[in-house]
Amino acid sequence: MVLLAQGACCSNQWLAAVLLSLCSCLPAGQSVDFPWAAVDNMLVRKGDTAVLRCYLEDGASKGAWLNRSSIIFAGGDKWSVDPRVSISTLNKRDYSLQIQNVDVTDDGPYTCSVQTQHTPRTMQVHLTVQVPPKIYDISNDMTINEGTNVTLTCLATGKPEPAISWRHISPSAKPFENGQYLDIYGITRDQAGEYECSAENDVSFPDVKKVRVVVNFAPTIQEIKSGTVTPGRSGLIRCEGAGVPPPAFEWYKGEKRLFNGQQGIIIQNFSTRSILTVTNVTQEHFGNYTCVAANKLGTTNASLPLNPPSTAQYGITGSACDLFSCWSLALTLSSVISIFYLKNAILQ
C-alpha cells in the first residue's frame, strides 16, 4: 500500500493513499458505498458524451473520481488507461468527469470525493447508458401452403428493453398484439403479404424490418365469358383465374385440346387470365369450350358454349317470307280502309 501511494504525485499522495486503503478493503467488483453521499441518476444514450458534474470548494481543495472500486482520477493524476475519460477544466472549481462515446460497459455508479478542511465530501452519480432498439434476428421470407400454421419471430436488443409489435402492411395494414412471436393458425390467401416488425424503446427511432409471406393455394376460375360471335369475324373467350403459384391455362373444345395457331386459334396466357381468340369464325368453331387452370396444388375448370348469333333480332321471330307476308297484308288492309273512308266522304 505504501509503495502504491509513493507512485502518485506528491500533492496527491494523501488522497491516493486514502482511496487505495478504502478500495483494498472491498471484495473484487464491489463498489464504494458512501452512505452520506447524495445520489444523482444520469441517462445518456450510447455513443454520446457523458459529463458527471463535481465541484471543488476552492482551487486548493483536492478531488478524486472512482468507478465502483477502481480509481479513475486522483487529483490531477489519471489512473485510468481509457483514452475516452478526462477531467473538465472549465474553471478552477470544476472537477467534472467527462466520458466520450459512452458504451454499455460504462454503465454503473461513479463517486466524486472532495477533500475539505474537516471531512471528505462525496457525490454519487449512477450512469445509465441507454441503447437504441436493434432487431438482430427476424424470420426469413417464406412460402407456405394455405392452411399451414405459421410463427414469425422478431428478436431485438436495447436499453430499456424494446417493445416489439407486428403489423400486416399489405394488403390490409392490420395491427397485431405486441410480442416477439406472431402466430398465425391456418393461414389463408388473404393473409399473404408483408409483415412489419417494429422494435421501440423511446431512445431513438424504432427499428423496423419486414418479412414477406407467400401463401400457395389451388387455382380458382373466377369468370369465363365471351362477346358476340359473328361468322366471318373474330371472336374471343376470356377466362379469369387466380392461384399461387400462377396457374397454367389450357383450352379444350369438347374433349379435344386446342393449341395456339391451330385452325385460326390464338391463345394468350397471362398470370391471372387466358384469352382464346378465333380469327375467322366458321360453323366449325361453334360448340362447348372449356378453360382449365392448374398448378402444383390442384386443377379446376369452367365451360362456356360458343353459339351462333340468333337470326331473329330485335324481338322479331319467323322467316323472311313470313315477314314479307305480314307487310303485304298490312298494305292491303291499309288500302281497303282508305277506299272505305273515301267512299263515305263522297256520299256525304
UniProtKB/Swiss-Prot annotation:
The alphabetical list of record keywords is: Cell adhesion, Cell membrane, Disulfide bond, Glycoprotein, GPI-anchor, Immunoglobulin domain, Lipoprotein, Membrane, Phosphoprotein, Repeat, Signal
Specify the protein's topology with respect to the membrane.
Lipid-anchor; GPI-anchor
Describe tissue expression. Answer: Highly expressed in brain.
Record-listed Phosphotyrosine modification sites = Y181
The record ties this protein, via PROSITE patterns, to: IG_LIKE
As for PTM, the annotation reads: Glycosylated.
Subcellular location per the Swiss-Prot or TrEMBL entry: Cell membrane
Q: Residue span of the signal peptide, if any?
A: 1-31
GO cellular component, alphabetical, reads: apical dendrite; dendrite; dendritic shaft; dendritic spine; neuronal cell body; plasma membrane; postsynaptic density; side of membrane
Can you supply a Gene Ontology BP term from the record?
brain development
| Chief place where the protein resides | membrane
Summarize the protein's role.
May be involved in cell-adhesion. May function as a trans-neural growth-promoting factor in regenerative axon sprouting in the mammalian brain.
Protein name as annotated: Neuronal growth regulator 1
User: Lineage of the native species?
Assistant: Eukaryota, Metazoa, Chordata, Craniata, Vertebrata
